[in-house]
Amino acid sequence: MNLLSIALRNLRYRKLASSLTALSMALGVALVVLVLTISGVIEKSLERTSNVGYNLIVGAKGSPLQLVFNTVFFLSQPIENVPYSYYMEYLPADGRLKEHARIGGELKEPQRPGLYSFLMQGGFAIPVCMGDYVGEFRCVATTPDYFGLLKHGDLNDREYKFSGGRNFVDYSEENGYFEAVVGSQVAQSMGLKLGDEIFASHGTESGETHGQGFRVVGILEPTGSPNDRGAFVNIEGFYLLEGHVAPDRDEDSGLEKRGTAQAPQRSGALSKVRLPIEKREVTAILLKPNGFAAMSMEKQINKTKFAQAVSPIGQIEGLLGVFVRPLRWALLALTSLVVLVSAISILVSIYNSMNDRKKDIAVMRALGASRDHITAIILLESLLIAIAGGLVGWLVGHALGPLSNAWTMPTTGVKIDWLAVQSSWELWIVPGLVLLGTLAGAIPAMVAYRTPVAKNL
């Protein structure tokens, strides 16, 4: 009979104590794996999402992180709005003229280039309005360029594709300004299909629901980004909803009344009247300046009194460095203490059994087993408990992660794969268990090594 078989038989003889000790080790390792997995997924998700296809977000003065959370992750509330005319400062002269002709309204010097247009050559600016909800999901009002110009993916090289339908357009004869594209998670959670109508609620999930709906003309393929949780509507239709006119600018504009666009219009020719420029505001502007102009533009914008420019990558890296990574190390320290206590319990369990095993050890010595053999058996017992508990804990830790997908997917868009190794630190678990098992078995092994044969026969 080899040493491993003897060690296994000894553990079976003390199966209750051995099982409980292994269970405590499994619990500690499961907690370590869970912390590494979830923190790794969150960190990679944040890093991937920060590569959003644009360099800067421009919005009202306030918290830069709040602006990023609201615009990129749809998790916070808008700070304030900026005038639509300010968005047009990023357009060239011909762009301003076309926008003025398309929308109408009051605009000073529409023929001149925008203040920042010289830094935008070859780039783009996309307006975004937020503040409403579609069910539990954020309503994002924007232009068709959101899915036409932006890309996604780890390398920011993947175009947005639709599992069904198409991108919304500025105006269609069938739906007017009231078309929408929904993310994959929105469609799945709300049971939406092409042709369905969605209704935005004002301000909060439980706010007053607007009477005018948006027709779903496209459903995005899953992207693994927050856009899976967005309901994207045509910004032109969004402006026509009640309560979406700039404050203190409610005078007659050629519209019957704020928010007078109603669903019954669909049966006939739809009104092409747009909200004038002076009555419009935007929550954020997504900018991709020309070449290396982002840094210069960010400084210039931040010198103004009412607007700020924020780099999403910089803010997310700051969040990771200040909050996510330190929290991960703190949780790892706590869970590692659980593993250490489990290793001590292995030591105590085997050590307490030594008095009952002195006669067995003496008999084995009398039958020809050397002291080294006895020491090796005790160390093997300790290693088997540590490794068996650790493997069970590893499996449990990876199994618990995906169970949280029911919560993390709808709220954050983060999906946890049960076998994915999210951190290189996880590769040190097995060597660490071997070391802990060896150290835990060292003292009992020394006791066994020194057990006198004659005295215990």
Placement of each model-derived feature along the sequence:
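A short amphipathic helical element positioned immediately N-terminal to and/or at the very start
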Residues: 3-12
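Short, strongly hydrophobic transmembrane alpha-helices
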Residues: 17-41
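Internal alpha-helical transmembrane segments of multipass membrane proteins
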Residues: 23-25, 328-349
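Hydrophobic, regular-secondary-structure patches
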Residues: 36-149, 274-275, 297-301, 305-308
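Mechanotransmission and gating elements of multispan inner-membrane complexes involved in transport
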Residues: 94, 117, 208-213, 219-328
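Hydrophobic secondary-structure segments that place a key small or acidic residue at a functional site
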Residues: 128-129, 133-145, 153-252
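Transmembrane alpha-helical interface segments in multi-pass membrane proteins
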Residues: 338-345, 351-405, 432-436, 444
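Short helix-loop junctions at transmembrane helix boundaries
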Residues: 391-432, 442-455
